[in-house]
A protein has these predicted regions:
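Catalytic machinery of carbohydrate-active enzymes
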Residues: 1-345
């Protein structure tokens, strides 16, 4: 398809595919290029588009369907795109791939499953990988774009979404303090098995707090038993990602694993409680505002932080008792409870 030809005005094209969190991190670049007098064009897939479509720092969006351009044709596609812009920033696999090493995996190319060989670094020792990959994600992103370390990853809700968020808090939540809990991320290690215990303990300790649990439709299984609790609003599969991100401004505390929701909250005043799994504090939350960063306590054959992508438990160490990832299981629930209570007074 036509990609618009050479832009007449000075324009940068920023290419970033992937999930919500990837796009939130990339959004930090947009105001930097606006300061330098660029028009900002973003080449993105549907998931990313949903997050940035209201960003005032974005002038143009090149939207493509996921896998519309086969992976083995991307370099050719990017070479063509480059000619249309005054500056071209290609960020695909700048984090996943470079700082989170990818294993063998199956991808669908032209409608057929194809085994893609993973990085040879996947078999390196934990120490070797840590030395290579313990780099802050935001710093790496800004360095690749050639802009200063002035970080502002941000979601921009519309006026209508802001109004909806305020009204939802007023009508659905009776407590003074609101804790939003992101139940799960995109990998098997991004779900916390002791969530129920933490919520139950906090509710018993204070009458001042209500919880909002969010996630995709599958996360509704994690909300079982809380449907009739007036101080727990179960919204997994009900709220869209934009509604969830718009509601962050109404929250006092945001809890969860390494997800796009936590990334979107990183510069907000709300207190963040992030549970690390495959990333280190240096990688993820080094520059976050008002944040408690939790790491797993030591366990046998300690693998944290692994700096690896996992597409299942064939590569991720699993706890037999809970069925969860060892890194997630061994984050101390008492630390989460304390952080919530201390920041909801």
């Amino acid at each position: 398809d036509d990609v618009g030809g050479r832009r007449s005005e000075k324009t940068v094209c920023i290419v970033r595919y992937g999930g919500f969190g990837d796009m939130i991190q990339t959004s930090s670049l947009f105001p930097q290029f606006k300061k330098k007098g660029y028009r900002v064009c973003v080449n993105v897939t549907e998931r990313g588009y949903d997050v940035i479509k209201s960003d005032p720092n974005v002038d143009e969006i090149l939207l493509q369907a996921t896998d519309q351009v086969p992976n083995d044709c991307l370099n050719e596609y990017w070479s063509r795109l480059t000619k249309c812009f005054h500056d071209f920033i290609q960020l695909s696999e700048s984090i996943e791939g470079a700082l989170l090493v990818i294993p063998d995996r199956t991808e669908i190319i032209r409608g057929k499953p194809v085994l893609i060989k993973g990085s040879p670094r996947y078999s390196l020792s934990k120490e070797e990988l840590h030395e290579q990959c313990n780099v802050n994600y935001m710093e790496r992103t800004h360095d690749l774009a050639g802009v200063p370390h002035e970080f502002l990853p941000k979601f921009y809700p519309t006026k209508k979404e802001k109004k909806w968020a305020r009204k939802t808090k007023e009508t659905e939540i009776g407590s003074n303090k609101v804790v939003l809990w992101s139940l799960s991320g995109s990998s098997c290690h991004k779900v916390y098995p002791w969530t129920d215990a933490v919520i139950s303990e906090v509710l018993s300790k204070t009458k001042n707090v209500s919880f909002v649990t969010i996630g995709d439709a599958l996360c509704q299984m994690l909300e079982g038993g809380w449907e009739d609790e007036p101080r727990v609003l179960t919204m997994s599969g009900e709220w869209s990602i934009r509604e969830t991100l718009a509601f962050l401004d109404q929250c006092d505390i945001v809890v969860g694993p390494e997800t796009g929701v936590l990334n979107a909250a990183s510069t907000l005043n709300a207190h963040k409680i992030v549970m690390l799994s495959h990333s280190s504090k240096e990688n993820l939350s080094k520059h976050w505002k008002n944040t408690t960063t939790l790491e797993p306590e030591h366990y046998e054959d300690f693998c944290f932080p692994c700096h690896k992508m996992h597409y299942g438990f064939d590569t991720c160490k699993r706890d037999e008792y809970t069925g969860g990832a060892m890194c997630s299981v061994n984050i101390n629930a008492k630390e989460i409870i304390t952080a919530i209570l201390d920041n909801s007074k």
